[in-house]
Amino acid sequence: MSDVVLLVLAIILITIFTLIYYTIFFEFDETTFSKRLQVLTEYAKRTNADKPTPDVLGHVSDVYDHTYIVSWFKTDDLSTYHETVHDDTVEVFDFLEQRFAAAAAAVAHRVAPLAAEPDAFVVTGDAGDVKLRCPQHFRFDYDQLKCVPVDPCAGRAPGRYPMDERLLDTLVHNQPSDKDYSAGEHLHHPTLYLRCLADGSHAVRECPDNYTFDAASGECRVNELCEGRPDGFVLAYFPETLRVNEFVECRGGKHVVARCPDQQVFDRALMTCVQTHPCAFNGAGHTYITADIGDAQFFKCLNDREAQLITCINRVRGADGQYACSGDARCADLPDGTGRLMHTHTDDTFEYVSGQTICDNYNVISEIECDTGNVLENKLFVNKFTLGAQFPREVLDAGVCAPATLNNVRVLSDAFPVENLPNDYKVDMQTSVVGLATMMADLTTGADPDTAFGQNVLLAREVDAVGLSPLTAESIDCFGARLFDVMDARRANVCTESGGDLLRTIEFGDGAFLSVFRDDLTGSDADYKQFCAISYESPLKIVNSDHFERRILANILQADICAELYTTIYQKYTTLARKYTTASPKYNYTFVKRPPNIVVYAENTHLKNSTISVPTFDPFAPQPADNKIGPTNALFDPFADRVWRSEPGGDGDHWAPEAPPTQPEAPPAPEPSPLILDKKELFYSCYYELPTFKLTSCHAENDVIIDALQQLRAAVEVDPGCEPAKDLHFVLNAYAYMGNGVGCRSVFDGNNVTVIKEPVPTYTFNNLQTQSDDGVRYNKHVHVKDGRYMACPEHLYDGAAFACNAEPDKLYYLDNMQK
């Protein structure tokens, strides 16, 4: 018994020892031990001459961008002491001094990849950059910040490849290694193979039973079935490509495909050729192929006598031996239904890849469709322009969807159309301004949209052209029956109705301007001297100069509206004092100057407030009659008071009675001052270089005119229905549309200022607030607030109080220059 006990005890001790040994063996990390030994050796080499080896030694063991781990171990047995985590933007570890120090400067990236060397990377240390390299068969993965095995399908086209030793270690055993595989690189697994897919991914596949992978052809080939069998032996082996009249038999120790005699088919149940219809012994639903059909076709029995030809994207055979259709139509155009199908968008301006479909054996295994929504859609530039180009939000770049830029979008044309919103003047500016493809670079980098637009357009005026082709940016003379540029309204072209030939070019000099609604395109205004011309050279400033006003000081002309109105008012408000007849002014145009001044003098002119001197002696003054009843006064009364006068050279002293006091004559009524027509101010409203409205401010130099203006403004008459527009009277000829077919206008009929209701409105507007159809306020001198309408020069309008601070010595008149 003692021997048995000792044997059992020995077995127990051996078992315990074995367990302890394997526990220690498996827990021991040889790689970590080797690294720590190298660290200790390096530290000893560099410091032992100065200081002894410490009991605990630290080193940087892991780096994750700005975060790093310092591992501390005991130097006597290399066992772990502890680990600490640190941020290199805060502190850095000094290996030789074994202490931490404050970071001197921030480092953007501690680890960076090298695009030209996939297996290398750069580590930025405290002393500078250090280039490191991954082991062979590995590459650096920046996302994971570590070396990973090289992709097995990297650099390989889609297809089947033999499974060598390295691929087996990496893909099957999951033990990637950096060892040298060159000795067995010609060896491969007999049945396993690598399938590289079109999307760059891979799969490990295995050939069916009795098949071996042929590395040369990349196909699974059947193993030899005729070994030890006689010639003529028919095999129960029916490959997918075997036709209905074919079978496999042995010849010379190898299997070959044999064919039945004409008009016969092979009965796979009887294993012999028979003369009958293929459906006769298989029935409805049976499928078969013949030599006269395509690779993607097969016959399907409808009954025992008829079959239907089926055409597929891809023909496959199931486990039951029957043919069926498979595959996706999107893969039909790819060789063998395998590959990558790129989705490309092409238009007049840009070309880009919007996505991809990856197929394998006619089946879609991956599909990517990027968000190609137009980033320019519904975008307005300078509040009126839209771009006639589509630029995607994303495109496919390097197999992934990425933000679209000019680096991953191909530019087919440097120019693209620019369209403007509809406007009240029916002006089409697509031939005036053309977009440049460089605009997309600014728009995709977050630049101000209006600035990016203005800096990346080509204007017709820049190349001294009347118009540009919207697609090519080339100079053109015709675009329809007429062509003009509102950004350079010096001229206009008249063409044939088809727009094929130029008939004439109209040049607009002083006194003429572009009138878009006239058939001859020419408007006239004696005061206009191209005041709406834009002097800027920068396209950005030009496209932003859509609405502005020019203020001009000029002389009143002989036949302009100021002379006409002031003459009428002067005639009405000047009369002679006693006869109450209107003083007819007379013009003397010989005194008109250039620049013209008009001074009109009335008959019996007299300046207002002048002083009339009464003569001391009036020999023609009548003597008053004495009508008192009584004795007649004596011709000579010696007792009356007399004044004696002695005249030199006279005969002596004489006396003369005191003359009675003279009754003064009433002074005549003041006569009117002369009508002076001197200065006027012109306010031209401009839509780019197109003059739209002209406000004339006539300066009054006569008190009688100033008084008359006050009286006219105080006694304004208003037609029924125009009460909300009574304040139009501040500016003559001002018009406002109030909706419901009511249009009101301020007029002067020679006697009074009246706001009349037009029988038929001259203009109707969809937007009453802006008095326009497109919502743009072109007329800056008509104001609308709370259903009330007022005409007032813009610089005199008080919007808060809805009041017009009209100048008492000014008369205002408004012209619509385009309609």
UniProtKB/Swiss-Prot annotation:
Cysteines engaged in disulfide bonds, as pairs: C207-C220, C260-C273
Signal sequence extent: 1-18
Glycosylation site list: N210, N588, N609, N752
Pfam families given in the database record: Baculo_VP91_N (PF08475), CBM_14 (PF01607)
SMART domains, alphabetized: ChtBD2
Keywords linked to the UniProt accession: Chitin-binding, Disulfide bond, Glycoprotein, Metal-binding, Repeat, Signal, Virion, Zinc, Zinc-finger
Zinc recorded as keyword: yes
InterPro entries reported in the protein's UniProt record: BaculoV_Vp91_N, Chitin-bd_dom, Chitin-bd_dom_sf
Localization: Virion
Residue ranges annotated for the Chitin-binding type-2 domain, each copy included: 223-281
Bias kind Pro residues: ranges: 658-671
Region (Disordered): 650-671
ZnF (C2HC BV-type) ranges: 147-196
This protein's GO CC annotations: extracellular region; virion component
Gene Ontology molecular-function annotations: chitin binding; zinc ion binding
Its biological purpose: Probable capsid-associated protein.
UniProt-recorded name of the protein: Capsid-associated protein Vp91
